[in-house]
Amino acid sequence: MRVKQARVPPLPEADISPELLALLGPRFKAMPMLNIFRTLARAPKAFKRFMAWGGYVLSDANSLSARDRELVILRTGFNWRSGYEWAQHVRIGLDSGLTEAEISRIKEGPVASGWTDHDRALLQATDELTQDAFIADTTWQALSDLSEKQRMDLVMTVSQYTQVSMMLNTFGVQLDEDLVLDPDLCKGAAAL
């Protein structure tokens, strides 16, 4: 975590309008409201738009497989040192077909041994997007097993989770009670 306490404190769940609660959908209604949503609810109009776009990225409308999507999201969160993003998506990644060994290896990126060419290309593209906001021609060609729509969804997924990571880090969104901070995400981060 970049900061030890929230800069933008999450709203108490009781203070969130029924209209905003309805945006969460069935997936999130069965659990306590996550800190990310309680924080973003402080900007209700933005929260509504965020949920629509984020809903696309996490839905079946995103043409990446759930496993590929989570591989990319986890690498994006790790690159931006977003402890909250990483912790939330480790469990989603496991549910989407990533193994614990693969999740650990994501931290090493595309240079780690054990990746398929497909996974390596996804990780390389993610690294290039988070470093330069561009995918090099050689990496674009390495993604040739993806359709045009899948390549577009790859870029849109990295861009969405870049934005999410920036908000989480800057607003100081703290981990939900059931999450554990990965110690590798503390390295090099200045805790305020």
Model-identified regions with their sequence ranges:
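Hydrophobic alpha-helical segments
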Residues: 1-192
